[in-house]
Swiss-Prot record:
This is Glucose-6-phosphate isomerase. GO terms for molecular function: carbohydrate derivative binding; glucose-6-phosphate isomerase activity; monosaccharide binding. It comes from the Bacteria. SUPFAM superfamilies: SIS domain. It is found in: Cytoplasm. The gene is pgi. Belongs to the GPI family. GO terms for cellular component: cytosol. Pathway: Carbohydrate biosynthesis; gluconeogenesis; Carbohydrate degradation; glycolysis; D-glyceraldehyde 3-phosphate and glycerone phosphate from D-glucose: step 2/4. The lineage of its organism: Bacteria, Bacillati, Cyanobacteriota, Cyanophyceae, Synechococcales. It comes from Synechococcus sp. (strain CC9605). One of its GO terms (biological process) is glucose 6-phosphate metabolic process.
Amino acid sequence: MSFPDFSASDAHIQWQRFCDLSWYHDDLGVWLDISRMHVNASDLQQLQPRMDKAFAAMQELEAGAIANPDEQRQVGHYWLRTPELAPSSELQQHISREIDLIAAFGRDVVNGTIKAPNGEAFTDVLWIGIGGSGLGPALMIKALQNPGEGLPFHFFDNVDPNGMSNVLAGLEGRLDRTLVVTVSKSGGTPEPHLGMEQARHRLEAAGGQWAGQAVAVTMLDSKLDQQAQKEGWLKRFDMFDWVGGRTSITSAVGLLPGALIGCDIRDFLSGASQMDAATRMADLRRNPAALMAASWHVAGGGRGQRDMVVLPYRDRLEVFSRYLQQLVMESLGKRLDRNGDVVHQGIAVYGNKGSTDQHAYVQQLRDGVDNFFATFIEVLEDVSDIPTISGECPGDFLDGFLQGTRSALTESGRQSMTISMRCFDARRLGALIALFERAVGLYGELVNINAYHQPGVEAGKKAAAAILNLQGRVEAILADGVARSADEIRLALGDGTDESIFWILRHLTGNQRGFSAQGDWSQPASMRFSKG
């Protein structure tokens, strides 16, 4: 495991490190270069015993071990692209059958065989999903949809009323021909439920027929699945209980959008499967995900002390940094390790796209605080319909900007790694996602945290539910028309805090809900609120 130590000023050493630390997959046409990370041979030697344990843990996970003890469930997203790895023949058949059903449904909607209830072809898709159920589909659409192919997509990925209003306004006149897909694993998550009810209300008001336009992606026998069965929805697809939202893109959550834009979803799965095979290798120097995880660990001192800046030099990958933000931060951002010790682990992720970012925050990356490492992503092949004009080729400039930024960062002693792809399509997107999924899993093992649960997210959901409950009680107190301060309401309730009650009242008075406020807003304690 010998290669030169990092040197920012010696071009010969940089070249030698590039040759020694480059990984390449011939069939996929994918390179990984970690030579500009400050990783030395001694670092990899020191990590080797822990990486060996990480390889073994990942092997157990793929074999069906309980990987998420909090929920006593398996973690099986790797089975989705290689069904024969699933621990039972019944499960293998179920996965394969779902893929076939998704592909057939998408094809039949796109070619007009499956029609809207009014007898016309579907014109649009309204996708309702939060977190990974929204980010994964958004990535699929941005990365893989070609102009004029498949159906246009519109998203409810938040409960912002203004956002919903804008989306619905954009569907005006086509709501009765819009396919509405609601994604909710448990069927009980508030955000997709609220979006679904708003979509149903507007669709039916426009003359649509909900059951004939609605599709559910959820666990079998969940609340949403039961509702879809009872109401006779157009289609239901399974969201397996052993697939987490942030790793659900190779399930129906990502495959259905792919099928509805005319993408070959089997190519997408094939790319992920090929990268899974490459990252399954228990050899640190020959496993790209292990090289990435080791680089992250060394760069951040095993404590996430450096942010990951994602710089894909293609517009199609503009959503990828946000997708990785959830995958990495929700997986690795943990207060406790598996021993119950407080560790506050995590890697912060941000980014957008090159070369746009060179005119934004790259200034700080080069000259400001050195608290990050960059991840460049390049695609070599350019489209053929953008010609060279007056000797100037946009693709050459894009490549030059990437190399220039990479060199400028190195000159400043800033760390980076680069992923290069010969071309970009569904197969390469699948491979790219699988590469990061495995790197996240391996890193989680290196720092001894559970990368497959999200207690912080659950805590936020419980706190939100408590606020909504408090709001109902505040409204009940004010129903008598008597003006009260936040403190008086708290005393009457015997619960809550002045601040949370003030926030609730400020929201209520900001909308036409019949509540009014008197006093000086700059003096919150002086404000009095009433209804009527």
